[in-house]
C-alpha cells in the first residue's frame, strides 16, 4: 500500500537551500512510489506560484495556507498583525493541517525547518509520526529555539540535522536521543567537465544568496588582502538589500576593482569554468547545498569550518 508523506515548507519558494534540497527529496520520493504532499504559507507572491508549478509538475500535491505569521512568534520575520491575529492564524493552520492529514490518510509528517511547529502539533493530535529536519544552528537569529528544545523533543519521533557541526551541536542539546544526520539533497547531474576557458584568467567565485550568515563581506576583505592582479571576484546569487549595501559601501570605500555581483541565475554553475575557484566563507551555516553542487561539478572548493 502506498505510503503518504506530508512535508511542511518553511517559505514555499525556491530561493533558499533548505527548500531546494527538500524539493529534490520530495521528487525522489515520488519516483520511489510514495505519495507526497506539501503545505506552505501562501502569501500570494509570484515566487510561490513558481514553487507550486515546480512541485505539481513533479507529481507533488500542494496546499497553500494563509498565515499572518508562519514561523514561531520569536522567529525572524517580525510581528505582523497583532498577537491575537497571530494566535488565531496559528490555530487555524494547525486545524487545516489536521484536516489534510485525516483527508489524505497521511502516514508521516516532516517539518523542513526548526522554525515551524504547526505540523508537529497536527501530527500529535492525529497520532501520526512526525520527523523534524533542522537546518539552523541555535545561534544568532535562530538562538530563540534553545527555549523550544523540550517541545521539539516531545513532538518529534525522530530528529534529523544537517551533517557536520550542526549534528554535533544538537547531540549536546538532546543528550538522551539519537540525532540523525543528512546532507542536502541535490538533483544535479555530474558533468563530464566544467566549461573550458580558452584564456588563463582565474576567478574566485561564490554561489548563493548574499547574507550576513553567509559572510561574503569577509571574502571581499580577503580578496583585498590577496591583491591578485587580473583576478576577479564574482558573486552569483540574489541578496539581502541591507547586506548588499554593506558590501557595496566597503568596495567603494576601499576602491576595490574586479568585484562583481551577477544576481540570481537559474543555473549558476553554467557560468563556472575550469579556471575558477569556489569559496564559501559562511560564519553560521550548515553543510549547504551549494557545497555539494560545487564538488559534484568538479570545482576546486574552499569552505569555512564553522
Could you describe each region identified by the protein language model?
Residues 16-24, 202, 211-225, 245:
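A conserved mid-protein helix/loop that constitutes part of the nucleotide-sugar donor-binding site
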Residues 22, 29, 204, 219-222, ...:
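A structural motif in glycosyltransferase catalytic domains
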Residues 39-46, 207, 232-245, 261:
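Glycosyltransferase donor-sugar binding loop
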Residues 63, 154-191:
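Donor nucleotide-sugar binding/catalytic pocket of nucleotide-sugar-dependent glycosyltransferases
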Residues 131-157:
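A conserved, positively charged/aromatic
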Residues 264, 283:
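Aromatic "clamp/platform" in nucleotide-sugar-dependent glycosyltransferases that forms part
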Residues 288-291:
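Short glycine/serine-rich donor-binding loops of glycosyltransferases
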Residues 300-304:
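Short hydrophobic beta-strand element within catalytic cores of glycosyltransferases
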Amino acid at each position: 500500500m502506498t505510503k503518504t508523506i506530508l512535508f511542511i515548507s518553511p517559505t514555499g519558494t525556491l530561493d533558499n537551500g533548505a527548500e531546494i534540497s527538500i524539493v529534490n527529496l520530495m521528487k525522489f520520493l515520488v519516483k520511489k512510489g510514495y505519495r507526497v504532499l506539501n503545505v506552505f504559507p501562501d502569501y500570494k507572491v509570484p515566487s510561490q506560484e513558481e514553487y507550486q508549478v515546480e512541485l505539481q509538475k513533479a507529481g507533488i500535491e500542494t496546499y497553500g495556507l494563509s498565515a499572518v505569521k508562519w514561523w514561531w512568534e520569536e522567529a525572524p520575520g517580525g510581528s505582523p498583525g497583532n498577537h491575537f491575529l497571530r494566535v488565531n492564524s496559528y490555530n487555524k493552520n494547525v486545524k487545516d493541517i489536521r484536516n489534510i492529514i485525516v483527508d489524505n490518510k497521511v502516514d508521516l509528517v516532516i517539518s523542513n525547518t526548526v522554525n515551524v511547529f504547526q505540523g508537529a502539533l497536527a501530527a500529535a493530535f492525529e497520532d501520526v509520526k512526525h520527523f523534524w529536519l533542522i537546518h539552523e544552528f541555535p545561534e544568532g537569529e535562530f538562538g530563540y529555539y534553545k527555549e523550544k528544545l523540550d517541545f521539539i523533543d516531545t513532538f518529534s519521533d525522530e530528529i534529523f540535522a544537517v551533517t557536520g557541526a550542526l549534528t554535533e551541536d544538537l547531540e549536546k542539546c538532546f543528550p538522551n536521543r539519537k540525532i540523525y544526520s543528512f546532507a542536502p539533497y541535490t538533483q544535479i547531474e555530474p558533468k563530464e567537465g566544467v566549461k573550458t576557458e580558452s584564456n588563463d584568467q582565474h576567478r574566485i567565485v561564490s554561489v548563493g544568496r548574499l547574507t550576513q550568515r553567509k559572510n561574503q563581506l569577509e571574502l571581499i576583505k580577503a580578496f583585498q588582502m590577496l591583491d591578485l592582479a587580473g583576478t576577479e571576484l564574482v558573486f552569483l546569487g540574489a541578496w539581502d538589500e541591507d547586506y548588499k549595501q554593506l558590501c557595496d559601501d566597503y568596495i567603494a570605500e576601499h576602491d576595490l576593482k574586479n568585484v562583481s555581483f551577477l544576481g540570481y541565475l537559474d543555473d549558476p554553475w553554467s557560468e563556472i569554468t575550469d579556471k575558477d575557484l569556489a569559496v564559501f566563507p559562511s560564519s553560521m551555516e550548515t553543510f549547504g547545498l551549494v557545497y555539494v553542487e560545487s564538488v559534484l561539478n568538479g570545482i576546486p572548493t574552499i569552505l569555512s569550518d564553522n
